[in-house]
UniProtKB/Swiss-Prot annotation:
Protein's recorded name: Follistatin
Region (Disordered) location: 314-344
UniProt domain TB: residue ranges: 30-103
InterPro entries the UniProt entry points to: Fol_N, Follistatin/Osteonectin_EGF, Kazal_dom, Kazal_dom_sf, Prot_Inhib_GrowthFact_Antg, TB_dom, TB_dom_sf
Subunit (UniProt): Interacts with GDF11. Interacts with activin A/INHBA. Interacts with MYOSTATIN/MSTN.
Disulfide bond positions: C32-C55, C42-C88, C56-C91, C95-C106, C100-C116, C118-C150, C122-C143, C132-C164, C168-C179, C173-C189, C192-C225, C196-C218, C207-C239, C245-C256, C250-C267, C270-C302, C274-C295, C284-C316
Pfam families: FOLN, FST_N, Kazal_2
Signal peptide (UniProt feature, chain positions): 1-29
Glycan-bearing residues: N124, N288
Primary location: secreted
Tissue specificity of this protein: Isoform 1 is the predominant isoform in serum but is undetectable in follicular fluid. In the embryo, strong expression is seen in the palatal epithelia, including the medial edge epithelial and midline epithelial seam of the palatal shelves. Less pronounced expression is also seen throughout the palatal shelf and tongue mesenchyme.
Functional summary from the UniProt entry: Multifunctional regulatory protein whose primary function is to antagonize members of the transforming growth factor beta (TGF-beta) superfamily including activin, myostatin, GDF11 or bone morphogenetic proteins (BMPs). Mechanistically, binds to these ligands in the extracellular space, blocking their type II receptor-binding site to inhibit downstream signaling. Plays an essential role in muscle fiber formation and growth both by preventing the repressive effects of myostatin and through SMAD3/AKT/mTOR signaling independently of myostatin.
Amino acid sequence: MVRARHQPGGLCLLLLLLCQFMEDRSAQAGNCWLRQAKNGRCQVLYKTELSKEECCSTGRLSTSWTEEDVNDNTLFKWMIFNGGAPNCIPCKETCENVDCGPGKKCRMNKKNKPRCVCAPDCSNITWKGPVCGLDGKTYRNECALLKARCKEQPELEVQYQGRCKKTCRDVFCPGSSTCVVDQTNNAYCVTCNRICPEPASSEQYLCGNDGVTYSSACHLRKATCLLGRSIGLAYEGKCIKAKSCEDIQCTGGKKCLWDFKVGRGRCSLCDELCPDSKSDEPVCASDNATYASECAMKEAACSSGVLLEVKHSGSCNSISEDTEEEEEDEDQDYSFPISSILEW
């Protein structure tokens, strides 16, 4: 009799627990995605078995959620073959409570969807003129540079005020930095490393394009910085009194080009393929010949084994309109970009 009286209560408790379990499972059944694509489908799976509230609690603008509780095979087919999961529900429908991070703001686009756009705070910028960026490009003002940094170049900074120049004339570098003209005849502001450790072995010796032996790459960079213009690397090892390129051993797939002007050779990269671009500007080379581009000039130099340098942009029969380029340093080396020599 006692067991009969308690049976209905136990059954009710069991049903209650079962209902609660089903409710909790239905609340958890769903998939969280990192973005909603232009095709309206969810892409980049973040986590499975999450409720919409849990998924959207991240605060990310692009986070989306799907309600379907499907197996791994279906998820795989959605991601690989179908361009994402269907029935995608974005977490954010408006800009309310959207945190886009520093330098960005949430705005509704033409499709009435919230989007984070670059909107740097330019209110404290005092210099309104053009600036030269670390990428060697001129920006119409610092605010334009900040927008470019926000979009695709997080390391972009202002080098100096004014347009990017070909010489250090009228370049005022901030702080303790110094103006240096690199091998491509562009002015950069760098910080000179005045202390270089003594080389551990003779393998660190480098021969500069000035015919001077430097103890290490650090010593070459230091000399370049203090000089204010690119010295450039001729070849690895101590400088030798070479009579021709036959006396110089180049490494790293480089080829020796002879500079008849100073009677020295330098190792240069000669594997560059010139792109078929109509936008390239012709150059007048040191042999007084006009080449379709600087790349074409380098190609001719590598073919002949004789060093060629740019005298000025444009045809040799024309006078360069850029007065700054007329003052370019003659001892340039097109084989080594600033990143390989001027790593401050």
